Amino acid sequence: MTKNQTISPLSIIGVISAGLRIYRDHFRSYFNIALQAYCWSIIPIYGWAKFSALSALIGRLAYYETLEQPEVISEARSRVERRMWSFLGQGILVGLIVMGGIFGLTVVGGIFVGILVAILGQNNPVTYLIGFGIFIAILFAYIWLISRMYIAALPLAVEDNMTATAGISRSWKLTKGAVLRIQGILFLGFLIILPVSILVILIIVFLPLAFGIIVNPDSSTYKLIVNLFSVAINIIIGALFLPFWQSIAGVIYYDLRVRREGMNLTTNPIKDRKSGV
């Protein structure tokens, strides 16, 4: 493909394919960044801010890879880490918005179910049916909120003169009407990592049993070894998965900008792009 061709939106499969290619081609460098991020996350507050910034750094790098305008990691890192505390504040704010929204819906749903119980009785099948419907509605509301804010860190990481709250507003604007596409992308991503996730669960379950054969399970040494290995495994697995999801986020951010704004550029995304769906 030539460099002069105008960039186009990606299909759902195209987003996944692009994210996987970026993840594969830059695995070593992204894994190193993610490993640092998870090691920093052990330290309260400052470490959490570093984790947030380094996570966003991977998304930024993936975004520019999608544009075929790769950045030098050290330069991108210095730009992102200057907003370290903004990333932490944004993460807290997003968490509060999601929890507040779900809490409000739960309270309203609980009151409504309580009224139904008072009118119809606790053992009435209609009460259970409506209660289940409210639960499903709250679950979908949670998914909707998460989808609307999934790329909130990307505008803060990429765009100039951006604040934490403006990044959330930007994500809200870009994801309008795109919740189903985003969920389709995330669902396919989940299916891709599912085998590894199952393997990790098996390791976590059987690891204490394996150590129990070597070391007395009642000893303090056994507990120390198991805890240390559990922390190490969680860090390594997190460092494996984080670049994958951030690569996907970077490509989603690119795709949404193309769809919403046209991104009047003469640069191509990575080669296996497809028409949007």
Kindly give the residue locations of the regions a language model identified.
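Juxtamembrane transition segments at transmembrane-helix termini in multipass membrane proteins
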Residues: 1-7, 16-18, 51-71, 145-162, ...
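Membrane-interfacial helix-loop-helix connectors in multipass membrane proteins
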Residues: 112-134, 207-228
